[in-house]
Amino acid sequence: MTVIACLREILSTARRTAVAEGASDAPASRVVLVPTMGALHEGHVRLVNHARDLGGIVVVSIFVNPLQFGPGEDLDRYPRTLDADVALLDGLADVVFAPAAAEMYPQGESSTRVTAGAVGGLFEGASRPGHFDGMLTVVAKLFGIAQPDVAVFGQKDAQQVHLVGRMVDDLNLPVTIAVVDTVREPDGLALSSRNRYLDADARAAAATLSRALADGVAACAGGAAAVLTAARVRVEAEPVVRLDYLVIVDQGTFREVAPNYHGPAFLLIAARVGSTRLIDNERITLP
C-alpha cells in the first residue's frame, strides 16, 4: 500500500499503477476511489471492500475538507486519526491519498467552487448552508486528481449521493457512482465518525433515529402522512433527541413529496442527540 500526501505524486500514481497491473480494458486497470474524511470505522471498511470487489486499483482519500464546514460547526474537533486509518486500510487499499488543506487549496479557500444548485439548499443544505458546495468542490477535485473509473459512496449520506450523481451527469464526468447500503450497529444506529462524540446517555438515545425510520417504514401502507406521524411519535418520546427535520423525498428529484405521492422515496431524518448532530435515512415505497 502506498501512502501519498502530495498532489504531484497522486496525480498519476493511481492510473500509472492501474495500467501496470493489466491491459487498458482489463478490470485490473480500473481505478476505484473511496472518498473519506478519515476517522474510519466499519462502514468505511464496507465501502473499501466493495471497491475491492469491483476489481482494480483501490484509492482511499482521507481529507477533512474545510469547505464543507460552516461557522460554528465541528471542523476543529472533527476526529483526525490518520495513523489508525492507514493501519486499518493496510491490505485493503492500494493507494491512500491524505493531503493537507494547503495541498488541496493552494490559493486558499476562495478558490473556484462547484455549486450544488437548488437541491443543495434543502434539508442538510438548509441546516448547513454552503456544506454541499464545499462537498461537491472537493469531490470534483478528487475526481480530477485520482481520475477514477468508479467512486464509492455510502447510502447514509443520501443527499450527498444524489448531488454527486447530479454533478457527474450535469458535467459529463467519466465516473460511475457506486452506492453501498448503510452499515448499522446491532441496535440500528447508523455508523458515523461522529458517533464517538456521544456520551453514554446520548449513545443509548441515538438509536431512536433508526427506530423512528423503522416505524415510518412500517406505516407506509397509510401513505406519506402516516409515515411521518409514526416516525415523529417515536422521536418525540425521547427527550434527549431534538428533531431537526423529518421528511419524505422523491428518490429521483430529492424534492419533498406531495401528501398523495405514490412510488419510491427516501425517508430522511436529522436530529441532535445531546450535543451531536446525526442523520439517517431509509428507502420506502408509498403505495
Curated annotation (Swiss-Prot):
Any single GO BP term: pantothenate biosynthetic process
Sites where the protein binds ATP: 37-44, 154-157, 183, 191-194
Subcellular location as annotated: Cytoplasm
UniProt KW keywords: ATP-binding, Cytoplasm, Ligase, Nucleotide-binding, Pantothenate biosynthesis
UniProt xrefs under Gene3D superfamilies: HUPs, Pantoate-beta-alanine ligase, C-terminal domain
Record keyword Metal-binding present: no
Positions contributing to (R)-pantoate binding: 68, 160
Alphabetized GO MF terms: ATP binding; pantoate-beta-alanine ligase activity
Active site residues per record: 44
The enzyme's E.C. designation: 6.3.2.1
Pathway: Cofactor biosynthesis; (R)-pantothenate biosynthesis; (R)-pantothenate from (R)-pantoate and beta-alanine: step 1/1
Binding positions (beta-alanine): 68
Function: Catalyzes the condensation of pantoate with beta-alanine in an ATP-dependent reaction via a pantoyl-adenylate intermediate.
UniProt miscellaneous comment: The reaction proceeds by a bi uni uni bi ping pong mechanism.
UniProt xrefs under HAMAP family: PanC
Name of the protein this chain belongs to: Pantothenate synthetase
